[in-house]
Structures are given as structure tokens and as C-alpha cells.
Amino acid sequence: MNTLQRLEATIAARRNADPDSSYVARLNAKGLPKMAEKVGEEATETVIAALTGSDEELVGEGADLIFHLLVLLQARGVSLDQVLAELDRREGLSGLDEKAKRGD
């Protein structure tokens, strides 16, 4: 089990814990809108760190972004394996071709 898989398992284990003792449980209690807001907030902080911060700040914000994304995915019933399978599917495809297929 790698770090992301362990983190996903930890998030699952804490999802229904007491919101007073678990940040994951607190996020779940607040619902999808709050989780989505946190992903957006962490994405913005990651971009800012990439443009103006140190490598250490970027690493920290990247970790926060991944954590909050995993919380959101799990709340929607989407597993890390599903996301990794999609990345596997896209491997070797031109990014421009992939975007064209999606109509982006």
C-alpha cells in the first residue's frame, strides 16, 4: 500500500467519526459544498505557492490539495483507483487530442 492508498484508507476510517475529534468527519458533516470549497481554496493556494512561494510552500500546498481532493472524491464515492485508471487510460494520448475528444 502506498502513501495515497494509506491516506485514502485513513480518510475512509475517519469519515463517520466525531466531528469534534476528526477534521475529515467535520468536513463530511459540512457536506459537499464545503469540501468543494476547500479543494478550490487549496488549488488557489497551490497556484500562488507555485508562482511566488518556495519549493517547501509548494510541496505543503500540493499535499493539502491532494488531501482535500481525496476527501471530496470519497464523499462522492469515487476511489483513488478510479482516478488512477483514468490516468492510465490517458497515458500515451496526446493532451491536445484528449481535450479535442472532450470538446474542451
From Swiss-Prot:
Q: Which reaction does it catalyse?
A: 1-(5-phospho-beta-D-ribosyl)-ATP + H2O = 1-(5-phospho-beta-D-ribosyl)-5'-AMP + diphosphate + H(+)
Task: Give its localization.
Answer: Cytoplasm
**Could you cite one Gene Ontology molecular function of this protein?**
phosphoribosyl-ATP diphosphatase activity
The protein's predominant localisation is: cytoplasm
State whether keyword Nucleotide-binding applies.
yes
Q: Name one GO cellular component term.
A: cytoplasm
Gene Ontology biological process terms from the UniProt entry: L-histidine biosynthetic process
Q: Which UniProt keywords apply?
A: Amino-acid biosynthesis, ATP-binding, Cytoplasm, Histidine biosynthesis, Hydrolase, Nucleotide-binding
Question: What EC number(s) has UniProt assigned to this enzyme?
Answer: 3.6.1.31
Which SUPFAM superfamilies would you find in this protein's record? Answer: all-alpha NTP pyrophosphatases
Record InterPro entries: HisE (IPR008179), PRib-ATP_PPHydrolase-like (IPR021130)
- Sorted alphabetically, which PANTHER family does this protein's record hold? HISTIDINE BIOSYNTHESIS BIFUNCTIONAL PROTEIN, HISTIDINE BIOSYNTHESIS BIFUNCTIONAL PROTEIN HISIE
The family line of this record is:
Belongs to the PRA-PH family.
HAMAP family, from UniProt? HisE
Name the UniProt record assigns to this protein: Phosphoribosyl-ATP pyrophosphatase
Q: List the source organism.
A: Erythrobacter litoralis (strain HTCC2594)
